[in-house]
Amino acid sequence: MIIEIVTIFPLFFKSFCDNSIIKRALNQQKVQIKIHDLRKYSVNKHQQVDDCVYGGGVGMLLSFPPFFDCLQEIKTPQSKVILLSPQGKIFDQVQANNYASNTPHLIILCGNYEGVDARILKYVDQEISIGDYVLTGGEIAATVVVDAIVRLIPGVIKHESAFSDSHQQGLLKFPQYTRPQIYQNQEVPSVLLSGNHAQIENWRQKESLKITLQKRPDLLINKKLSSKEKVILEEIKQELKNNS
């Protein structure tokens, strides 16, 4: 997979690409990440890429020509172009899976200042937001999107690890514990020490449903539960009701 990021702050991504799973994926050639400095496509001798807003308004807007010229150079018939924008669809695990599985070439455009000239939208396949809040620029959001996608590329991390992550199955992950077994009078649940894999799996399934119900009940609205999960969920609701 090739990911190309268009930004006015190319150095922002250096440490991101030099650490952890991203670095491993790059070293293993599971992914290529190319950073493009938008200023290099400026038609201004001072490499200016922003200008005042037509009709008046506060702040500066990223210009259309640099983005257009950059896309003319790097876009291919296989490319998908996304613009990081507060107006975009909220990025989620479903989208991450879709891009990791079906997009050999992804181009990410980072907005800044007051946004981008609206004419670039003609060349964008999807606008994406990472949440209903304001960031200084699209670079932080780009690292979120790239990290979520890259870790799903086959071979980057163990399949079992990615498969069991929160949100991957539409639910939050069950609680996890490590040594010591007892600390500050807090004990690891005994079932996890039993060695009974069936009981452990049942416990994890129930805890996953319970945590999702308590912390992110909205996830259960569109989640297609199995018959077993439906029974467990009703048990959880009754237990919580009895303990309230």
Swiss-Prot record:
CC per GO annotation: cytosol
Gene3D superfamilies xref list: 3.40.1280.10, tRNA(m1g37)methyltransferase, domain 2
Molecular function in Gene Ontology: tRNA (guanine(37)-N1)-methyltransferase activity
Top-tier EC class: transferase
The keyword Cytoplasm appears for this protein: yes
Residues that hold S-adenosyl-L-methionine according to the record: G111, I130, G131, D132, Y133, V134, L135
InterPro entries: Alpha/beta_knot_MTases, tRNA_m1G_MeTrfase_C_sf, tRNA_m1G_MeTrfase_TrmD, tRNA_m1G_MTases_N, tRNA_MeTrfase_TRMD/TRM10
Function: Specifically methylates guanosine-37 in various tRNAs.
Similarity section: Belongs to the RNA methyltransferase TrmD family.
NCBIfam families: PRK00026.1, trmD
Name of the protein this chain belongs to: tRNA (guanine-N(1)-)-methyltransferase
